[in-house]
Regions:
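Short hydrophobic/aromatic helix or loop-helix immediately within or flanking a transmembrane segment
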Residues: 48-59, 69-90
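Membrane-interface anchor segments at the N-terminal boundary of transmembrane helices
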Residues: 92-96, 311-397
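Transmembrane-helix motifs of polytopic, lipid-linked glycan transferases
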Residues: 96-120, 153, 157, 161, ...
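Specific aromatic-rich, kink-prone transmembrane helix
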Residues: 111, 150-168, 179-184, 201-203, ...
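Juxtamembrane membrane-water interface segments immediately following transmembrane helices
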Residues: 35-61, 218-291, 295
Length: 440
């Protein structure tokens, strides 16, 4: 009898949690719909919104194999997805972008947290759903024209699939590898740099299998599925411009973040890394720029270390304040952030940009990193599944961080993996909350 009562109470608790896991993303989605109805045009341009629309214009005029320069300078993936929506309605395109991205984000949040709720990590499902659904920067970015929030949703789907796959250790299903590979394929279709993060996650996942054969099969299936994305982008450029590339801006991006006098941000100072064209050519190709920058890093270890520190600070910098560095000036949060009104007065500007503001900004940067690694430490100690979640989450964040160090220091680059960094940070916060509550 006692067992039945205990089980009934447990079921009731699980049902209550499930309702919250549905309610948070749904309420956030409704808030976004209301927000869209009060925004001129139904949404916002992201940091590169105009350039994405230039790509859509080229595709809309000439089709998939448009020769528009923007489609080979930058990866064509995200503009292609927008173009498909434009074929439905060009006049309501921004509304369609906001609605589709918001639905996807809401579903991914639910899918991840619902799977977590069925494991030893059920205790973080509630706060993770709450903080991700209502994080003003990450969640509201679904209303902006940009790949960042959809990529964050893709990573949530991948982690949810991994959790679902490992819940039943006795069952090996190849479909999980296909699905996970497909989501990383979508993420890297929008921004190829996240292909590397996906591959690291697959490796970590595969190594958790006692059977090396099963682990190898899983990794290979996920990898092959993922590689369909860059293959498609390369094929498009081969047909369109007879060039086997995904994009031609990597060298430019790396050059901006390197040099003797610069600090690694977009506002570079001093001369660029010297790079001489290979004869008989008189111009430097993008690939040659990449090689020149890599050589500069290797031959200037002290300067490379200093730049790495600067870029790390920029990567974790606040969205506003005296230490801000990056391309998030169109961050939806800044439209309602209290500091934005505060700096309009001289006394407020002195407070925000003075010693007090700098202290708060440094505490914000250090706090993010400390909570990230503390959350990682907490989750790794629970059981093999939570260890896998911790390893997969941190690996994606660190890869994104390292890519920023290798290119440009920009706080926007942390947004696509912010769903995973929030999971670790919220785990740290919730664990501390439990300890304080228990102590009191």
């Amino acid at each position: 009898m006692a067992k039945k009562v205990k089980q009934a109470l447990l079921n009731k608790k699980e049902q209550k949690l499930h309702r919250y896991l549905i309610a948070f993303p749904v309420i956030a989605f409704v808030i976004k719909l209301i927000t869209m109805s009060n925004i001129q045009g139904g949404g916002w341009l992201g940091a590169d919104g105009e350039n994405y629309f230039k790509g859509v214009d080229g595709l809309y005029a000439d089709g998939l194999f448009s020769k528009a320069e923007i489609l080979n300078y930058w990866p064509a993936g995200y503009p292609i997805l927008l173009w498909l929506l434009a074929l439905i309605s060009i006049t309501k395109l921004v509304y369609l972008i906001g609605i589709i991205q918001s639905i996807f984000f809401a579903w991914a949040t639910y899918y991840l947290t619902r799977n977590l709720s069925k494991t030893s990590l059920a205790w973080i499902a509630f706060p993770v759903s709450l903080f991700i659904s209502f994080n003003p920067t990450l969640s509201l970015s679904t209303l902006a024209v940009g790949y960042e929030a959809p990529v964050a949703a893709c990573f949530m789907m991948v982690l949810g699939i991994i959790v679902s796959n490992k819940k039943d250790q006795a069952e090996f299903q190849i479909k999980h590898a296909v699905f996970a590979g497909a989501w990383i394929a979508l993420a890297s279709f929008m921004q190829p740099r996240y292909l590397l993060a996906g591959l690291v996650i697959f490796l970590i996942w595969a190594l958790t299998y006692a059977s090396k054969k099963q682990g190898l099969i899983l990794a290979m299936v996920a990898l092959c599925t993922t590689l369909l994305s860059p293959a498609a982008l390369i094929a498009r450029n081969v047909v369109a411009i007879d060039q086997t590339s995904i994009s031609t801006n990597l060298g430019v991006t790396m050059s901006i973040g390197a040099g003797d006098e610069t600090k690694g941000g977009y506002n570079r100072t001093g001369p660029e890394v010297p790079c001489v064209p290979t004869p008989p050519s008189t111009s430097v190709t993008d690939n040659q720029k990449v090689v020149c920058v890599v050589k500069w890093y290797l031959t200037n270890p002290v300067k490379t270390l200093k730049l790495s520190i600067y870029k790390s600070v920029y990567f974790w910098s606040p969205w506003s304040g005296p230490l801000v560095e990056g391309t998030m000036a169109r961050n939806p949060w800044l439209k309602i952030a209290p500091t934005q009104d505060l700096v309009k007065t001289q006394s407020g500007a002195d407070l925000v940009n003075g010693p007090f503001g700098k202290m708060i900004s440094w505490l914000w940067i250090l706090g993010q990193v400390v909570f990230l690694f503390y959350g990682f430490y907490i989750l790794r100690r629970i059981d093999p599944l939570s260890k896998l979640v911790a390893n997969a989450s941190l690996s994606a964040v660190v890869v994104s961080w390292l890519i920023s160090i290798g290119t440009i220091g920009d706080h926007r680059f942390r947004l696509p993996t912010m769903s995973l960094s929030l999971l670790l940070q919220v785990s740290a916060f919730w664990n501390l909350k439990k300890k304080v509550t228990k102590a009191l």
